[in-house]
Amino acid sequence: MEITETIRRLSLFGIPRGGTREVRAILARLVVARSISLGELQTARDIVERAAGRVDDAAYIFLAAMFISQRGGNACLRAGKGIALLVDGGYIEDAPDDDVSNGEYAAMVQSAWKAAISAAETLAGDVIMKKPASDGDCWYFQRNLAAVTAVSSALAARAADADGEAELSEAELKAATGFDGFELNERQIEAVRRVVQKRFVVVTGGPGTGKTTVVCAMLRALMARALALDAIALAAPTGRAAQRMGEALREQCARSAGLDTDMRRKLETLDGITIHSLLGGSPPDWKYSEENRLPLRLVVVDESSMIDLHLMKALIAALPDDCRLVLLGDRDQLPSVETGAVLGDMVGMSEAPFVVRLTQSKRFTEDFARCADAVNSGDVDKFTAATSELAANDSQWLSSFDDKITENRCFRCFFPGKMDLSVCRERFAAWAAYYGLLGDGRLVKLASDPMLKDDESLTDGVLSEKAEAIFSELNRSRVLTVVRNGPYGVHGINELLVKMRFDGRLPFNPLVKTGVPVMITRNTPSRRLFNGDVGVTVEGRSGIDVIFPRGDKVVSCPAGLLPEHELAYAMTVHKSQGSEFENVMVVLPDDKEHPLLNRQVVYTGITRAKKRAVIVGTESALVAALSRRIERDTGVSLDHMV
């Protein structure tokens, strides 16, 4: 009686006040299928009631479609997609006894949609807005349309004109692009040239295509033209991505040729910070905004695919008119968790003069690059040809993993039919043991060194040789999951591995032992710890401490005072964005219909690896993932600039 009970519960909240049987049944079905929440329907009720009797309850159906669209990361709903969203959103594999079949439900939605559109037309102009488009009307919640309009117009203005800087001379270009052991390619040089001349540039490319090299070169060029160090900001959406940005820049500075001591020192002091830290405060009460602009002349943002529409709006509003904005990113990675895919919209514009695409990767071998390309194109046959097979039932699979090729390779470890949980758990444990995370493994030994108590990493926050060795070992491997819950998710795998670390027991507090990977889940500036920071427990001065890398420094915190955190033997692919590991295991869910299976999650997962990646799951799950690509409708349009 699930549908009947849900209809009764909704009626207690006045949802809807009247309405036909079909309207009530559709809304209940969407709630049971968890495609819409009670809170969202209460908001819909408030919108309908504000219309003061001007619309009938069919408006609930249209608003439900808008909420489902927004949940999918879209800033708007195209009217032509409404029926499909509602039908998919209300699909239930095993329909309750008191419900209609999926086919009957779909017919019900189609029958109700015309009245829903008519009701929406009456509501238009207040909380929801209609924007005509050549490929169908776009419907927005007012907040989203305001953000789309602001981002589109601001970026269009930035990209439309030069900032008055003269082109780089050949001498300037040579001085800025000198590196030991390699030369910049034509596209990288073009990116440096454009950044000097334009107020807005997007540099896009996959891992290893040289985005950080471009940043280093453009900083050298602009600083040689007297751009002050305190007028520059490097930022990223997450703490880990910001940290990695600073680390990567210092690595490239070390390889820079012909760099005088003063400029090298300045470049090495640049650190990445989160966009939230850059803007100060929290939304909507940012410290820096349109009324109080940032005192900057250049802002470089990495991992821009992760920036949602509203954060992009806040960032752009806070920039002075004469400030350059450079966005770096890979459009093939996962988009932001929240609404929008601004980077994807901009990169997707053909021949856009503000976009430079880098295509030559120096990180991946030809085989690995072919694998990544196959994932992006959704070509299962090419993926199979570009990967090596590891037998799921082979207990020695990790040995063969290393034997087949030493590095730069992608592997597949597929179960026939359904995944075997007991075998998977054996493989997860074998992986953790192989990479020194369990028992007397190398990470555990390094973290248990009694000499750490007096090490300068703990006493002075310096990245000592001991601390560097620990972090290097920690990043030798990582298990990446698509989902958080269940045996093939973050929680299940972390619980399995920490039990093995504690001889089969699930500890009340895992931080009482050394060598346990930990990830911060809440920004805590007072501790200099941020969401996404990954550290490890070590033998401290007065018990167990947790140390985190911070460029050439170390942040240390007593385990008992650690802010909100979780284990990090495994982490989601989403959380891994902006990170690199030598070897990764990407674990697919056992349900091929899982909504989080898509090309971007597979691509993002395997490209976190610097050496090897192995995908564990079923072939049907992989096929399902490659058949889907996240396509978001944001409405951000700069076409008139192209």
Q: Predicted segment positions?
A:
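C-terminal accessory regions
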Residues: 533-642
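Conserved helicase motor core of P-loop NTPases
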Residues: 332-518, 524-527
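Conserved pre-motif I regulatory segment
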Residues: 172-200
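Interdomain "pre-motor" coupling segment immediately N-terminal to P-loop NTPase/helicase cores
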Residues: 98-168
